Amino acid sequence: MTIVTEALTELEPVIKTTFTVEEIRQLLPHRYPFALVDRIIDYVPGQKAVGLKNVTINEPFFPGHIPNRPLMPGVLIVESMAQVGGVILTQLPGMKGKFFAFAGIDKTRFRRPVVPGDQLIMTVELLSFKMNKIAKMQGEARVDGQLAAQGEMMFSIFD
């Protein structure tokens, strides 16, 4: 390797492909009890992210949903996917520090219950981003490889 090649290699930006919970907290405004992503385990800039949520019996929603058979509410599964989508959006050029609001869901289905002890793996893909204002994404959540939920999500930027 020549000196020039070494210098160019050092100048190439390092593409981040994972995010810790601390890094996610720097990107998203959500806090307990509404921070629903523990880690981003795979990230392709401008395209997709895979996040995980460790579902424990200590989640604040389990005592009321449902007392004798704790289930993670479907709306929180969708919110978890939306937060993974939020990580994708915050990493787009010019979007750092912007606030993205969840603007809608379509074609959402729940396929299996999510219960304490499950690890929810959420894959979210960016389908479109129009005029740097409206984003559309496709998400799915799996537990042990089984589809738990899927749907399309819309986001809007608030300045």
Curated annotation (Swiss-Prot):
S-S bonds: none
Residues at the active site: 65
EC number: 4.2.1.59
Matches recorded under Gene3D superfamilies: Hotdog Thioesterase
CDD domains named in the record: FabZ
Keyword Lyase in record: yes
SUPFAM superfamilies assigned to the protein according to its UniProt record, in alphabetical order: Thioesterase/thiol ester dehydrase-isomerase
Keywords: Cytoplasm, Lipid A biosynthesis, Lipid biosynthesis, Lipid metabolism, Lyase
Gene that produces this protein: fabZ
Highest taxon listed in the record's lineage: Bacteria
Name by which UniProt lists this protein: 3-hydroxyacyl-[acyl-carrier-protein] dehydratase FabZ
Provenance organism: Microcystis aeruginosa (strain NIES-843 / IAM M-2473)
GO cellular component, one term: cytoplasm
